[in-house]
Amino acid sequence: MMNRRNTIAKAGAPFAAAAILALGVAKSGQAETWSAAVGAQSADKGKQALAFLSNELWIHVGDTIRWSAATDEIHTVTFLKTGQVRPPLFAVGNSGPFVGCPNATPDGSNFDGSTCVTSAPLTIGQTYTVNFPTAGNYKLVCLVHSRMTGSVHVLPTSQSLPHDQDFYDRQATQERAELLADASGLAGRGNAAAQQSSANGVTAGISAITATGGGSSNASVMRFLGATINVRVGDTVEWTNLAASIFHTITFGTEPANAFPPFPLALPIDPDGVRHAVISSPNQSVNSGVIGSPNQETVGTPQAPLDFTRFRVTFTSPGTFNYICALHDDIGMKGTVMVHP
């Protein structure tokens, strides 16, 4: 994990929680609506902060939080019950109806820990509001991105709050800038990795997880690094996904209706476990399936198989071969292989 630089505040700072509250913000006498952001992105959308900003808030019983989506990449605002099995995003891979818990719950729903509350997938400009009628400490998650989490501490009205909205706004601004700066640095690493991994290597996204006391976030580059590559007939190009917990695809030709097809795919697999396709025409359709490393080693769960993080294609004829990530082409994740005689 990357360490967060110049963090404004961290949960668990080296002084008692009672002291924090004693110096904090008193109850105004009426329920308040707090504001937070969901995600951040660069102007070209290629650098994404998969984060709740801020990802830790203290509020009073009866208060409301309104989350505003700030990216073209989709996210959800989700509160699961403790012990609830995390649902998939969609019924069929990346298509079909939204599963939710079940479905999306109405904007302005109450969450007290007894039933799940979730937005539908949100994109830039959309908002979702949750009311908190009961004191407690609640985990916030995004159903799209497994390492995007936060927390909400709901205190009795008799207790003061440690921070006000201005604090959270400043914190969010700083964290947004840091995550996008981290992503800019990752782009250089991804380009270097592409040059070092193989003679004809492409990095299919790169990311790094950061954390505060309230949860985890992800600085991500959603681009093919080495996106335009020149090779000769008979050469093999290798794509490697360096994005922790984020799936990508390498898709030539017609985009499949479902980027998460049934497995195993009808593709040859090299002795080192890498899917390997052969393409002989720019009109040929080939899909890698999702590649990435979502699995986390967790005590008490069965050992997961080795992740598919690479994909290879051998080109047997000259031409211009355009490809996309079927999950993120809408934010510009595209590439080209120029095959020369």
Could you describe each region identified by the protein language model?
Residues 1-2, 24, 220:
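Intrinsically disordered, low-complexity regions enriched in serine, threonine, proline
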Residues 3-15:
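Bacterial N-terminal signal peptides that target proteins for export
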Residues 14-24:
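Bacterial N-terminal signal peptides
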Residues 27-341:
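Extracytoplasmic copper-binding redox domains, predominantly the cupredoxin/blue-copper superfamily
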